[in-house]
Every structure is written in C-alpha cells, then in structure tokens.
C-alpha cells in the first residue's frame, strides 16, 4: 500500500472488516466514483478474523431475513465472479428444542421462512440423529433443519470483497488510521488521517467495536458496546464429517460447527462480560487481539456441550478463545444516517452475527447513501 492518499473523495469508509469491505464493494460496483476505504491496521484485524463464520438465513424480522439471504447469495456469486474462495459450504443447520415452548418457537420460524422460500424441515425427536449422528437426544423434543444454511471463512469473504471493490475502482488504504472526522455546519467535510487530510461528501463508519468512541468525538451517540465472546476448538475427532451441519441449542446457549475435522463450541451466555473496563476506550492498537481466558465462566457451558455431544468428553481442547464482539442493547443492527451529522452513516452493531449480515448491510448502506445523493 502506498502512503500517498488522495486529498479528496466522494465517500470515505472507515473500517476494513467484513462490513466496511462490503460497503466499499457495493458503492464501487453500483457506480460510485472516488470510494476510499481506510483501515487503521490490516483488513480483518478487529473482530472479523476470529468470527465463527456461521451463515443462517432466518432472522428476527422480514428485513433481517432479507439481508441474510442477500448475503448468502452474494457470497456464492462472488466465488463465481472472482474465482476466489470464500470458504462457503451449505452444510445446513440443525436447531434443537429441549422444551415444548422452544419447539413452538422453532415451528413458528419454519412457518415464517415459507414467506421467503427458505426450505425448512420440521423434525421429530427420532429424526434428529439422522441429521446429526453425534448428538445425544435424551432431552430433545424436536427441531428444525435448514438445508441451505452453512458456514464460511470470514477472512476469505472479506478479502474477496476487498479485491472486488478495487476491481470496480475503490481504493483501500491499510495502516491509515483516522485521527479526526471533520465537520462543518452540521455536515461531513472530511477526515484527518495518519497520512493527511481527505475532503469528502460522505462518511460510512464501519469500525465495529471502535464505532462508538469514534462517533462520540463528534458528539454522535452510537449505542454499541463490546462484550467478551468465548469459544473452544477441540482436537480432531475421527467420527466427524465435513458435511456435519451447524448445530444450535438455544436452551443451553450453545452453537457448534465442524472446523477442519474438529468441533468449535461457542456460547451466548445469559450473563455476558464487558470486554473492556471503559467501553469508550477500546485500545486503538487492539489488532488480532485476544482477551484473557476465563475457564470458570465457560466451564458450565462446556459441560452442557459434552452432554449434547458425548464424543467431546474423549477429546482435548486445542484452542480456548476469548475475544471481543460488539453488541447493541436491542440486538438490532445500526445502519443509516445519524441524526446529529448530515451525510454521516453507520454500519455496525451486528451482535456477533456480522458475517451472515455484512453482505446485506453493505447493500443497505448503498441504498441509503444513493437516496441521499439523489435528493
């Protein structure tokens, strides 16, 4: 990367994770000129690099479901378009219920999915082992299987988006931190960076867990905070198949996926832990970073995982991971123009499901900014 950056641009995207690269890709592909993306360190170095990479199609609303489906189709098309690998495999997802209330919720999801032509199979208890042979179903009452869900490589997708964005004319500058966002009369004027100032008409802030503190410097409030997020990666299992579906066990706060012959066990625990003492002060140099292990916090969930997948009892832990993820109070994404500053847009707050959301979120940011440009 050259340190010589342009002095002006139409739009500056701040953040080189999967969300920022998706925004840059969509803007450039659909005709925006002078698109610049700035990344303080390397692409994916914030939280994208350690994401589990699950790709689910059903969201909590029609809008989120459409965004997720767009993401899935985009990632498939990008492989064909570029010949580069995104690591996408549609091995399906199995979600189980251990209570009748949960089963009723899953059945509602299956009905909801029909509106979007998403294939969902409702399963009786005795059908679940046919889908997931390693599972203990003693306490399971039923479930749903979504054949075209799957998983992908977050770094691979980001790199493909970045390369495609550059093919369409966007410029990407790594190791170029933003010192200050410049405003005038309540509107965006530009950015002051490590390598000089850039005048621009629009800014899209896609800086993940840094977004809150960056926006706070220009008195824009973004309700987002980083929590600790845990998973473990097992040693290889002989019994595991590469086509093993993603498994979700909401009653036990678990998700599991096959990972190169191993099993990744992640949790969304009821009482999460703040990742940093001051959520306005995420360290600027926190790149490819990990947080201290807290096995006592994770252990009860690991025990539940071993009950669910007994094969885990006889295999070691290759990696214990604790890293930050950005969450919002209502678990909704933060997308669109801020009320405080004109032409200042945000694309963040994906609540640890950024991989399956980023493709659609980038398209939404394109639509928002294009509408503004047409006014």
What do the predicted segments below correspond to?
Residues 200-243:
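Central helical "cap/lid" subdomain
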Residues 220-223, 236-343:
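Active-site lid/adjacent beta-loop-alpha segment flanking the redox-cofactor pocket in flavoenzymes
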Residues 53-131, 251-256, 260-264, 289:
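Dinucleotide-binding Rossmann-like beta1-alpha1 core, especially the glycine-rich loop
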Residues 148-198:
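Helical element adjacent to the flavin cofactor pocket in flavoenzyme catalytic cores
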């Amino acid at each position: 990367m050259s340190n010589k950056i342009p002095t002006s641009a139409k739009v500056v995207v701040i953040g080189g994770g999967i969300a920022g690269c998706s925004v840059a890709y969509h803007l450039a592909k659909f005709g925006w000129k002078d698109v610049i993306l700035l990344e303080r360190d390397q692409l994916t170095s914030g939280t994208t690099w350690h994401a589990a990479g699950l790709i689910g199609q059903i969201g909590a609303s029609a809008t989120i479901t459409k965004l997720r489906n767009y993401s899935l189709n985009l990632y498939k098309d990008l492989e064909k378009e570029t010949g580069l690998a995104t690591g996408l495999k549609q091995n399906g997802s199995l979600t189980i219920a251990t209570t009748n209330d949960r089963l009723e919720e899953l059945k509602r999801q299956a009905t909801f999915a029909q509106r979007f032509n998403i294939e969902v199979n409702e399963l009786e208890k005795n059908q679940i082992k046919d889908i997931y042979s390693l599972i203990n179903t003693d306490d399971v009452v039923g479930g749903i299987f979504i054949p075209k869900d799957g998983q992908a490589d977050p770094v691979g997708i980001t790199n493909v988006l970045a390369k495609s964005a550059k093919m369409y004319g966007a410029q990407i500058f790594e190791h170029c931190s933003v010192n200050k966002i410049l405003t005038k009369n309540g509107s965006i004027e530009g950015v002051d960076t490590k390598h000089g100032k850039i005048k621009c008409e629009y800014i899209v802030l896609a800086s993940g867990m840094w977004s809150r503190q960056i926006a706070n410097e220009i008195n824009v409030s973004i309700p987002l905070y980083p929590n600790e997020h845990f998973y473990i990666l097992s040693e290889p299992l002989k019994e595991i198949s590469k086509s093993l579906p993603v498994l979700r066990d909401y009653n036990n706060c678990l998700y599991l996926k096959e990972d190169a012959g191993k099993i990744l066990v992640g949790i969304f625990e009821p009482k999460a832990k703040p990742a940093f003492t001051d959520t306005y002060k995420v360290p600027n140099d926190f790149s490819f970073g990990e947080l201290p292990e807290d096995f006592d916090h994770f252990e009860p969930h690991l025990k539940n995982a071993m009950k669910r997948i007994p094969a885990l009892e006889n295999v070691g832990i290759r990696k214990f991971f604790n890293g930050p993820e950005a969450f919002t109070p209502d678990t909704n994404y933060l997308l669109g123009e801020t009320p405080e500053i004109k032409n200042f847009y945000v694309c963040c707050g994906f609540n640890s499901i950024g991989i399956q959301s980023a493709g659609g979120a980038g398209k939404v940011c394109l639509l928002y900014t294009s509408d503004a440009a047409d006014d």
